[in-house]
């Protein structure tokens, strides 16, 4: 599975995203041809090689060739994309980004979604940036997007609504739920379009997931900041599936002062948030206190999200994590017919069949028979694949 990791060390904007995808292999002519599926005119595209702090990158610019361009409502943009000649996946990605952007604008201005009126983001260059991002991800075959945290930035920015603090209100709204860094200098580092791309598409935040790199693209922003190169780095890679070695993180903490009833809820929250496995084990701590060790196996991209759950849903005031590797066997999920009815099972590549607990539990409760008897029946009747 191809994945893209957005390393937003200096920030992200729509033009930086398209530029990085061009550097990764999206031809400018393909971008022009695909964008022709939109009923837009009065613009030209250009891309060039640039340098930021000694690092080579690519810039992308949309130049208006007609002065009068209309401002657009969200409903009009959504309809335009839906009725365009764009590919279905490109439409779906672009619609997701625009909807997140519209939801943020609606919340900031206190208006219904259908009444959201775009200014900067309704202009042609922003539409091209968002749809261009969707075209690039589709062209490169990207199936999943992951991202680092985003720099908050500071200062003020001039907008159609006047002088606003950095990040702009819509950007700040879009940043909710995304890890942020606050050690960067003056200036707008994340635009509303850039924040919407990450908020709509990223499946996880933090370090990149385990992958085999295929290429790296550097998309350059217009400004040249003094303290670091104004570049968005996008890593394109192939993520292993099925049997093989997988890089994971192990999160651990020791808890000796929590109501035992809370542990079950904590496990549920972690698993729902994407933890690969959660376990509790007893241990004896200093001063001979009985305690519980919480161990979480996680995808590296989920570190921030799962750490936040542990620290908010338990009495832990800290946790440690370290990298590990695991080997998984290829498997598939099936539904098998038995004398007790249909049962969900996992079938390993060796042919071994293992019953699914939830499915067996449901049968045991419905038929009023012991769970262990359900397991025995399924194992006897399903046996090998």
UniProtKB/Swiss-Prot annotation:
InterPro entries, A to Z: Ni_insertion (IPR002822)
Tagged with keyword Thylakoid: no
Keyword set, alphabetical order: Nickel
Pfam families reported for this sequence: Ni_insertion
Keyword Glycosyltransferase in annotation: no
Gene Ontology terms for molecular function: lyase activity; nickel cation binding
Disulphide-bridged cysteine pairs: none
Gene3D superfamilies reported in the protein's UniProt record: mk0293 like domain, Transcriptional regulatory protein pf0864 domain like
PANTHER family membership: NICKEL INSERTION PROTEIN-RELATED (PTHR36566), PYRIDINIUM-3,5-BISTHIOCARBOXYLIC ACID MONONUCLEOTIDE NICKEL INSERTION PROTEIN (PTHR36566:SF1)
Family stated for the protein in its record: Belongs to the LarC family.
Protein name: Putative nickel insertion protein
Organism field: Geobacter sp. (strain M21)
């Amino acid at each position: 599975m191809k994945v893209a990791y957005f390393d937003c060390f200096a920030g992200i904007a729509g033009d930086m995203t398209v530029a990085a995808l061009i550097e990764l292999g999206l031809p400018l002519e393909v971008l022009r041809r695909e964008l022709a599926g939109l009923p837009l005119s009065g613009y030209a595209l250009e891309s060039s090689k640039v340098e930021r702090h000694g690092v080579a990158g690519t810039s992308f610019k949309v130049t208006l060739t007609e002065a009068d361009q209309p401002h657009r409502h969200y409903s009009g943009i959504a309809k335009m994309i839906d009725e365009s000649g764009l590919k279905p996946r490109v439409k779906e990605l672009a619609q997701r980004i625009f909807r997140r952007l519209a939801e943020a604008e609606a919340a900031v201005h206190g208006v219904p979604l259908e009444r959201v009126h775009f200014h900067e983001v309704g202009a042609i260059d922003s539409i091209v940036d968002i749809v261009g991002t969707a075209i690039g991800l589709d062209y490169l075959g990207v199936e999943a997007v992951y991202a680092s945290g985003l720099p908050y930035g500071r200062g003020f920015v001039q907008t159609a609504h006047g002088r606003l603090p950095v990040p702009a209100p819509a950007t700040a709204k879009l940043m909710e739920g995304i890890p942020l860094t606050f050690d960067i200098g003056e200036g707008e580092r994340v635009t509303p379009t850039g924040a919407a791309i990450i908020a709509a598409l990223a499946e996880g935040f933090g370090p990149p997931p385990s992958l085999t790199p295929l290429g790296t693209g550097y998309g350059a922003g217009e400004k040249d900041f003094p303290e670091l190169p104004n570049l968005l780095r996008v890593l394109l890679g192939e993520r292993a599936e099925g049997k093989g070695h997988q890089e994971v993180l192990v999160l651990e903490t020791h808890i000796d002062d929590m109501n035992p009833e809370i542990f079950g809820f904590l496990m549920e929250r972690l698993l729902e948030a994407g933890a690969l496995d959660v376990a509790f084990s007893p241990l004896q701590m200093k001063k001979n206190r009985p305690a519980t060790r919480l161990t979480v196996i996680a995808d590296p991209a989920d570190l921030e999200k799962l750490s936040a759950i542990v620290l908010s849903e338990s009495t832990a005031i800290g946790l440690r994590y370290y990298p590990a590797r695991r080997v998984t066997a290829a498997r598939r999920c099936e539904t098998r017919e038995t004398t007790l009815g249909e049962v969900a099972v996992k079938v390993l590549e060796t042919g071994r069949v293992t019953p699914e607990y939830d499915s067996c539990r449901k049968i045991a409760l419905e038929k009023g028979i012991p769970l262990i008897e359900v397991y025995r029946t399924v194992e006897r009747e399903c046996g090998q694949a």
